[in-house]
């Protein structure tokens, strides 16, 4: 005979008696379950079950044979006549003389520890199970407001990177870790950390300061455990762990269709009519449900158990509330993953429970389940300060009152005295309060915070996003003035340091309407609170850098990364909090350390190295060599063999009147050019061209169209630069390096501005071959004239020095429009065929008036710099020049003089002054004879050759040190 048949016969005799009995208050304990579930009514897998024929049975405990249920004889162990009969597990029927039978337990009902049942022998049925539903990666929502929750919270955790290879803590710029994700790992917001978001069940998103890829992004990264679907004997498909799991490890997200209550009830009836026996509804929040019946993921196969090894929890991810399955305890590979449906799992009819646990309630759902168990989750019970009976056995002498049959959860919680709130319990309270959807639970949780007088607890509440969570509760229950007063009282007791958290939570916007809500008490408290908050100061915080999630990291080669790591390590050592190594105390003389300086002076480490004294030349003097000897010269041509000790005489400044006249002429030319400039210009080419079909370009090839005009000009300048550099390289030995670089930039700017002004640029990322030729030709003409100008400048100065002229700079005259302009590209020099083919030449075929006008506009951009530079006092003049080469043509001297003045002005504006080329050395007869004093001075100073070499190096790198004017 099977034990199931034995249990069925036995249940018929005591069913009515058990249902009419009450548990003794001092012995009764229960197991939480949902929607009822009697501990005395069990299905055929676990023992006692209700029989339909048990209607007219009387209490027949005395007449029961000993073969069915052993009866203990109390007279053998005691003088009382009590009799007990064991029904099942720890539950017994106790009878006393003259008293009705009572149902009691010998001890508190605890689940007997036993080794976990493994299902490793069952084959993997994942592929077979996927046919029965549609697989989804994430939840779908009936509308965008379903599952919505406020999220504006950031944790205070800092990035904590560790090497994946060595395990050492690293401190490098975040960009380097983003480039090498396989070599590093961010340990911020880990399981053992004090992360505020993790404690309040909020996942970190991109705007948190903990950095990318922190440990609190399990839902977002879908860090699911290794599981497999198995086919069980009675429960259908189930979920099995394929690897060992640690407590509170994330296993799977419960994914499905998020629907409202109306859709939920319609689908309940629909599935019942379709003959679907297994429903997969989970309550997400008040009036919102997750339906994974027809669409979901593998998490839907997690079965029910009265002694579960998993639990379901809700987390805030971004602006959505999501549900996940987590490990309750250590789980071995091969165990079935089960959780208790007693909280929010729904079905049409009561379903028998086949978990086989000693504390099995018999049914998963339905009215036959006991009403003595609370429907609250364990997390909510802990947050309310109500512990189970087993925990109270050791905490207090008197056990708490258990829930009565038919008693509401709210009535039961009201009758139980909760524990006082402690600092380590704040996290659970705030997490439950953030997800609370029932008013009476919110009132109880707020009451625990309100009654607390410990300052540390209040600080902890503020730290755990207290202002944000209370703001959401205030918004939810703003129509109930009693709840509002409760929240305002809590806010009034919060510690007040700065307004930062108040501003971040935006709670002032929520409280402001309460000042005119109609309730006198609420209005007074709200106004007082806002007035007090307004007096607080805002603490300065370094703003957090917002990272663009779509931005791609720039490539960094291996050597640059090494250098950056070294620099970062040096800085981290200098910022290290660890105490630096202290200087060792003297331990007495040591033979090996004794030297010529003696043992009493520890600071002598050998002879002091010789330091060469650096005596710069006076202002306006320069040094040069001739046959190994050094002579000195000034900018105006004075030479001497003796080292000067006073600054060189400076030329007189130019007359102010001539300078003002030159500036006025430039301004008049610019104003006239603006008046004559046409408002609109036609971009139509001279000759109509045959339209060609525009090829469809792939997305991303024309990103430049979204750029601003300045950025497009920069792109176009980079496109032109290789062709400009080709010409510049040919003039390396004809012009000074600094002038060459400056001219290259100037010609690039002029070409870019001219082409954009005349609408010649169709694509700034490329130019045609004809345009390349035009650019090179223009650059060559520009630099040819620049070379001519440079040589004319040198020739003029050399002639002055040769004739012994008094060095005075001629007063600059106002250049005409043609002379003030730099070299322009001539349109007449282009081929006529090019004029017809390219729209570029069609715009350039206008007369010289247009060129002058463009030149005037070009000068306008530099007018401010020119005027400001005129106010500076020039204390140095251009140096003398070497003689002009015989092959140079001096006919352009007059024109070069005027261009020279512009060049001098531009040099002064840029604060650039290159040491002039040296003139011929002074006659040998002027060389001073060596005297004992001179010899003595030379002996005390470094060698003359070394000094001259250092001076030349210094002049090449920093010419303004000696030539500063």
UniProtKB/Swiss-Prot annotation:
It comes from the Eukaryota. Its EC number is 2.1.1.359. GO terms for cellular component: chromosome; nucleus. The AWS and SET domains are necessary for transcription repression. Belongs to the class V-like SAM-binding methyltransferase superfamily. Histone-lysine methyltransferase family. SET2 subfamily. Histone methyltransferase that trimethylates histone H3 'Lys-36' forming H3K36me3. Involved in transcription elongation as well as in transcription repression. This is Histone-lysine N-methyltransferase, H3 lysine-36 specific. It comes from Aspergillus oryzae (strain ATCC 42149 / RIB 40) (Yellow koji mold).
